[in-house]
Every structure is written in structure tokens, then in C-alpha cells.
From Swiss-Prot:
<keyword id="KW-0004">4Fe-4S</keyword>
<keyword id="KW-0414">Isoprene biosynthesis</keyword>
<keyword id="KW-0411">Iron-sulfur</keyword>
<comment type="pathway">
    <text>Isoprenoid biosynthesis; isopentenyl diphosphate biosynthesis via DXP pathway; isopentenyl diphosphate from 1-deoxy-D-xylulose 5-phosphate: step 5/6.</text>
</comment>
<dbReference type="GO" id="GO:0005506">
    <property type="term" value="F:iron ion binding"/>
</dbReference>
<dbReference type="InterPro" id="IPR045854">
    <property type="entry name" value="NO2/SO3_Rdtase_4Fe4S_sf"/>
</dbReference>
<dbReference type="InterPro" id="IPR016425">
    <property type="entry name" value="IspG_bac"/>
</dbReference>
<dbReference type="InterPro" id="IPR011005">
    <property type="entry name" value="Dihydropteroate_synth-like_sf"/>
</dbReference>
<keyword id="KW-0408">Iron</keyword>
<keyword id="KW-0479">Metal-binding</keyword>
<dbReference type="GO" id="GO:0046429">
    <property type="term" value="F:4-hydroxy-3-methylbut-2-en-1-yl diphosphate synthase activity (ferredoxin)"/>
</dbReference>
<feature type="binding site">
    <location>
        <position position="300"/>
    </location>
    <ligand>
        <name>[4Fe-4S] cluster</name>
    </ligand>
</feature>
<keyword id="KW-0560">Oxidoreductase</keyword>
<feature type="binding site">
    <location>
        <position position="268"/>
    </location>
    <ligand>
        <name>[4Fe-4S] cluster</name>
    </ligand>
</feature>
<protein>
    <recommendedName>
        <fullName>4-hydroxy-3-methylbut-2-en-1-yl diphosphate synthase (flavodoxin)</fullName>
        <ecNumber>1.17.7.3</ecNumber>
    </recommendedName>
</protein>
<comment type="similarity">
    <text>Belongs to the IspG family.</text>
</comment>
<feature type="binding site">
    <location>
        <position position="265"/>
    </location>
    <ligand>
        <name>[4Fe-4S] cluster</name>
    </ligand>
</feature>
Length: 349
């Protein structure tokens, strides 16, 4: 059992974060927030996928003023992503958002920061300090020579100090870079010094499969060291794909189990069925199952049921026919064309 780092408890809406709460899955909309219908539609898709917290970009006052309308029509907590303009943060709070992603050192004079913090305190809204290696202060780049993990942590500490001076402690922190090991080292260093909950992820990872690999290694490494309270997989793809990958990372690292885990053989010269097609059919048929079950789709009797005996349900194909098995025990033999349907029927019993 992995011992998680002890962090403070905060709440984003009704979702608990830190202090032993489950590692939460976040994503971010990729719509123009000002397009209310499109944004709500995408958030509802994220809700169906199991997303627990959603972040939306707030580029201007028009976007800020539609947040309340969006909030009314979604179920999960919503975080407003604010840069530079304190008035956008104040409007987002007024509209009823559940959290802010804002760097207080970037929004101007102290009185502006104080206004935002006072409003956040009154509404019990947490703030995520989001440090990105690509946008560190110039003096830190000069001090360290380039965007090092130490520079990232120092940048976060500057923002934290501003909030703590105003007696604000409802804080979550992220320290992201597109370089996996730089990100990991930044989180390691920060977590050795502070107990604020951490939102972890690798930024700008790119498309599938590159982004999935980078995110899985970076997030997985941190989780296995007990670091991380919320995660977001950043991909040049649908946010639903981000959520699906996030849950797979949590499943593999042993933190959360949700839905169907499919194990299937890579195929070899013994395989006489179209495994790729069968896996696709099984995934599609079981896509709405929420209970954690393991399903095996194997290409021959060598791989199934023997090598897949830990699966709750499974099939193993052969030329013209195949077997259906449960917990490694063969239930029946059916025609090859009936294998997938027989498996689905057994699961739904």
C-alpha cells in the first residue's frame, strides 16, 4: 500500500481534496467559454466520463459574466482560470464559481490582490497557484540560468507568501513543465517543504500517443511516491480522452478503480481471430459500466483462460469457435461469431 503524503484538506464545491481524500480527476474545457451551449455540452460529456472538477478559461469580462449561467446547468464544481486581470477574478467569484486558478503575483498592486482574496474568503473559494516553467519571472530565470525545478518552487513560494500575508490558506498548488523529470523534481522539492495539496500533471504533452506516455510516466511516478491530490492529463485531444487516461493511470497505480479494465493479448502467429475488432466491440458494449471489473479478450487457448485467470470474465478465440470463462473456469464453448455477445450476456447477468 502506497503511503500518501499528508496534505491539508480543502474543498472545491462539495469535492474534498487532500488529507486522505481520493485522488480527484480534473479536466479543462476546450470550447470558447463565451459559447455557453458548447461549453455546457462539453462539461456534461465530462460528467458522464467521471470528471470530478472542471476548469474553464476566462479570457475577458464577457466570458466571466456567463459563468453563472454555465454553473446553473452543470453538476460538477467549476474552476475559473484567470490571468493578469483581477476584475475577471472578482466577476468569476460573483458568478458563483467553486474555485480560482490564479497567480496573485501576476494581477497587479497589493490592493487588487486583497480585493480578490477578501472576496474568495467570503465565498469560501479555494485558489490554485499554477506555476508553469514557460512563464517564470525574469529574475528567477537570471538567478537559476534557465527554468529549473528550483525556480519553479521558488515562484510558487512567492505566490503563497502573498496569500499567507493576507491570512489566506485555502490553497492548492501546481508546478508544471512539458519536461517530465523537471516536473517530477519540482513536485518532489515542493512536497518536502510544504503541506498544501498538489494538483499534478505534465503540461503541453502533445497528442496521443506521445502525450499519454509522458503524462502516464510523470503522473504515475509522483503518485507512486505518494505525491498528488488531484490530477489532470493534458492532451491535444478531447477532454473526455484526458479523463479516461487519468482514470487508467489511477487504476494502474492502485489509487482508484472505475469501470471496465480490458486486458487483451498482443496477438501472435497462433491467433486465428480478429482480436482488435473484438476488443473494440467489447469496449463499446461496456462503455457505460461503472463498476470495476476486469475483462479478458484473448486470441488463443494459450493466453486464455490460463494467463488471464485473474480476469472476472473473459473469452479466448479459436478458428471457428472459442470459449467463455469466468475467474479462469471455462463456462462454455460457442461459435466464433457469437463470442462477444456471449461474453456480454454473461457480464450482464
Amino acid at each position: 500500500m502506497i503511503k500518501r503524503r499528508q496534505t491539508r484538506r480543502i474543498y472545491v464545491g462539495g469535492v474534498s481534496i487532500g488529507d486522505g481524500a481520493p485522488v480527484r480527476v480534473q479536466s479543462m474545457t476546450k470550447t470558447d467559454t463565451r459559447n455557453i451551449k458548447a461549453t455546457i455540452r462539453q462539461i456534461k460529456q465530462l460528467e458522464l466520463a467521471g470528471c470530478e472538477i472542471v476548469r474553464v478559461a476566462v479570457p475577458d469580462i464577457t466570458a466571466a459574466k456567463v459563468l453563472g449561467e454555465i454553473k446553473k446547468r452543470i453538476k460538477i464544481p467549476m474552476i475559473a482560470d484567470i490571468h493578469f486581470n483581477y476584475k475577471l477574478a472578482l466577476e468569476a467569484i460573483k458568478q458563483g464559481v467553486d474555485g480560482l486558478r490564479i497567480n496573485p503575483g501576476n494581477i497587479g498592486a497589493k490592493w487588487k490582490v486583497r480585493e480578490v482574496i477578501t472576496a474568495a474568503k467570503d465565498r469560501k473559494i479555494p485558489i490554485r497557484i499554477g506555476v508553469n516553467a514557460g512563464s517564470l519571472p525574469k529574475d528567477l530565470i537570471e538567478k537559476y540560468g534557465h527554468p529549473t525545478h528550483e525556480a519553479m518552487v521558488e515562484a510558487a513560494e512567492r505566490h503563497i507568501e502573498i496569500l499567507e500575508e493576507l491570512d489566506f490558506h485555502d490553497i492548492k498548488v501546481s508546478l508544471k513543465a512539458s519536461d517530465v523529470m523537471k516536473t517530477v523534481e519540482a513536485y518532489r522539492l515542493f512536497s518536502s517543504k510544504h503541506d498544501y495539496p498538489l494538483h499534478i500533471g505534465i503540461t503541453e504533452t502533445g497528442p496521443v500517443p506521445e502525450g499519454v506516455v509522458k503524462s502516464s510516466i510523470g503522473i504515475g511516478l509522483l503518485l507512486l511516491e505518494g505525491i498528488g491530490d488531484t490530477i489532470r492529463v493534458s492532451l491535444t485531444d478531447s477532454p473526455v480522452v484526458e479523463v479516461n487516461v487519468a482514470y487508467e493511470i489511477l487504476r494502474v497505480t492502485g489509487f482508484r478503480e472505475k469501470g471496465v479494465e480490458i486486458i487483451s493479448c498482443p496477438t501472435c502467429g497462433r491467433c486465428e481471430v480478429n482480436i482488435k475488432k473484438m476488443v473494440k466491440q467489447v469496449k463499446n458494449a461496456l462503455r457505460n459500466v461503472k463498476e470495476p471489473i476486469k475483462v479478458a479478450v484473448m486470441g488463443c487457448s494459450v493466453n486464455g483462460p490460463g494467463e488471464a485467470k485473474e480476469a472476472d470474465f473473459g473469452i479466448a478465440g479459436g478458428k471457428g469457435q472459442g470459449i467463455v470463462f469466468v475467474k479462469g473456469k471455462i463456462l462454455k464453448t460457442v461459435k466464433e461469431t457469437e463470442l462477444v455477445n456471449a461474453l456480454i450476456e454473461e457480464i450482464r447477468k
